[in-house]
Curated annotation (Swiss-Prot):
Protein name stated in the entry: Mitochondrial import inner membrane translocase subunit TIM14-1
InterPro entries reported in the protein's UniProt record: DnaJ_domain (IPR001623), J_dom_sf (IPR036869)
Function noted in UniProt: Component of the PAM complex, a complex required for the translocation of transit peptide-containing proteins from the inner membrane into the mitochondrial matrix in an ATP-dependent manner.
Name of the gene encoding the protein in the UniProt record: TIM14-1
CDD domains, A to Z: DnaJ (cd06257)
Lipid bilayer topology: Single-pass membrane protein
Listed SMART domains: DnaJ
Transmembrane segments: 7-23
Principal place of residence: mitochondrion
Amino acid sequence: MATPFIAGVAVAATALAGRYGIQAWQAFKARPPRPKIKKFYEGGFQPTMTKREAALILGVRESVAAEKVKEAHRKVMVANHPDAGGSHFLASKINEAKDVMLGKTKNSGSAF
């Protein structure tokens, strides 16, 4: 007497689980695509900053106009300024990158 009842409950539970599984799969497939995350440069800083490294830090090409360099510098500094919780080390590297891109290098390297 209990066996048919247990079998019925098992069939009902399987049907409900299948229904919710199908609904979850359809919702998963219908979700909007996530934007692709930009891949970050995996290397560290060089002892003496090159123009290529400066361009990578500022997010510009190596052969870009001075106005674009200044605009990129401002954008990156706003995001990483020490007064806004950013790192002093990164701020010095960003400033050094701007100097390298604008041709104002002192060949002294970073203070850090």
